[in-house]
Curated annotation (Swiss-Prot):
SMART domains according to UniProt: Elp3
Annotated keywords: 4Fe-4S, GTP-binding, Iron, Iron-sulfur, Lyase, Metal-binding, Molybdenum cofactor biosynthesis, Nucleotide-binding, S-adenosyl-L-methionine
UniProt-annotated stretches for the region Disordered: 319-339
Pfam families: Fer4_12 (PF13353), Mob_synth_C (PF06463), Radical_SAM (PF04055)
Cofactor: [4Fe-4S] cluster
Protein name, as recorded: GTP 3',8-cyclase
Binding annotation for GTP: 17, 71, 102, 163, 266-268
Keyword hit for Nuclease: no
Assembly with partners or alone: Monomer and homodimer.
PANTHER family in UniProt: MOLYBDENUM COFACTOR BIOSYNTHESIS PROTEIN 1, MOLYBDOPTERIN COFACTOR SYNTHESIS PROTEIN A
InterPro entries given in the database record: Aldolase_TIM, Elp3/MiaA/NifB-like_rSAM, MoaA, MoaA_NifB_PqqE_Fe-S-bd_CS, MoaA_twitch, MoCo_biosynth_MoaA/MoaC, rSAM
Keyword Nucleotide-binding belongs to the record: yes
Amino acid sequence: MPDKVLDLRNRPLRDLRISVTDKCNFRCRYCMPADIFGPDFEFLPQSKLLTFEEITRLTQIFTSLGVGKIRITGGEPLMRRNLPELIRMIREVEGVQDIAMTTNGSLLSRHAQALKEAGLDRVTVSLDSLDNERFGMLNGRGYQVDSVLDGIRVAADAGLSIKINMVVQRGVNDQDILPMARYFREQGHTLRFIEFMDVGNSNGWRLDQVVPSREIVRMIHEEMPLVATEANYYGEVASRYRYEGSNQEIGLISSVTQAFCSTCTRARLSAEGKLYNCLFASSGDDLREPVRDGRTDEEIRELIRAIWERRDVRYSEERLSETPGLDKREKVEMSHIGG
């Protein structure tokens, strides 16, 4: 039986998000804007990235503390060479119940079959518009929508479970809410709408660009009636709705207007081995050094336990309460820890 570890607010450690690279082939403005992450930007050298063996070892230690769900992130995780091999290694870890991956989808058609065969269960594809011109502007590199839709089709054919994430920004892509809902309802994939968040320090976040989830629900409900659905499990971040008369669902991730800090069970491991206890964290705890310095599994396990047991973060709740000085706090970039 895995040990149970709780933070200062009695939140268990259940989910581990593992970033495998800080690189991405997109330059989305809310994550990795091109004016900051330009040609001269210095990404992590290979020597500083956790190896697959180190990631697998840490995964084993995390599962001994109660983690059952693993999500592979980036950057863009498919830019890490031989990623299916890592999936295979994690799949063999006792206690791992579910392996998912978040991707921009542009490289998915090349790798979906190998990922499925290696043991990947699910994939979440980030897609913010079906309009080619707008999508090219949003991804900052002129990628076309078809490259992502092709990846989704190949992944579905391979047998991967698929969800789509759409970050909604008022005045940027809010006109795409209904077209996205119609399209993915027809395709049979769950579409999740995410409120534009103040992650990192470089995405130019403004509160007036947030489209509240309740507004999105109202907009869709007027055309395609929705019925609220119960959560699947403790700590589920998305509020779920199904289309009336069907089992097809949408989800709403309302991290700005309806903070879910009180049930957050996620830890985040960056590509170079720092452990972050919140998406909005200012700093992380280094696990790479103890791994490479010869610490035993038990020593690293107790280090992780201590980090989680002193966890007291609730950034989104503090944002809602307008905590003084919150907007001046430095935060890790989302591209570094995978959202």
